[in-house]
Amino acid sequence: MNGHDRNGPAASELKLAGLTPFTTIDFPGRLSAVAFVQGCPWRCVYCQNSWMQQRSFDPGLEHSSWEELESLLKRRHGLLDGVVFSGGEPCLDPALPAAVRAVKEMGYEVGLHTGPARLAEVLPDLSWVGLDVKAVPADGAHWAKVTGVESAQDKWTESLGLLLASGVPFECRTTAHPDYFSEAQLLETAAFLRARNVKDYALQICRKPPGLIARFGAVDPAWPSEPVLEKLRSGFERFTLRRD
């Protein structure tokens, strides 16, 4: 299925950097594939996929395609529940709305990892969203420090409002390292989310793979402290700590 959007390019034009054919952890409660979309407007200090940042493919690297994803989904009927579009920033690609609809028409649920743009166009067709909280929501300087982009939080605030009004299940998640996220800033972030009735929050401790834009040391297993973790857990229906 080629999947045309009424006001945009066909699903076949989606720029896919790579595919993970099976995962149990990227789409809560579902067995899913992950489609990594090429291109990202952010330059996050903790980025582990810097080769996906440009919209054009690196000629020295292999990449995937819509046809490969389509073939995978045809073979995996009855074995997979859904597809997660990740990146990069999947909402940057104008072919995403058509791709989301095409995947739904094949009988799969669709999840999205985003931190955001074009969210309103695809939200009605989504079953779940993982929304990146890249910095303290009300602190523009912190967003600029973490993402490398001025006024980065403006679109994020708009997207949080869309999600809260939509009824679509979603998780807010923060990837943190003590070099750029203090314990006080973690608590400030959690308080902001609780005040807006966010139910599901995850803290992801920054790992240290090769290729990071900034070089960080390994995070002490005792960070953040247990008292801070207890405060983070309170007030959310679901709190998840991810260290791997």
Name each model feature, range by range.
Residues 4-9, 25-64:
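Canonical Radical SAM [4Fe-4S] cluster-binding loop centered on the CxxxCxxC motif
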Residues 70-75, 79-82, 91-217:
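Conserved AdoMet/S-adenosylmethionine-binding subsite of the radical SAM
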Residues 36, 86-87, 115:
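A secondary-structure boundary/capping signal
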Residues 2-29, 178-244:
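Auxiliary Fe-S-binding modules of radical SAM enzymes
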Residues 62-65, 152, 221:
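Residue-level preference for long, well-ordered alpha-helices that form the structural scaffold
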Residues 58, 88-92:
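Short secondary-structure transition/capping motifs
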Residues 51, 87, 133, 205, ...:
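Residues that line or immediately flank small-molecule/substrate-binding pockets and catalytic motifs
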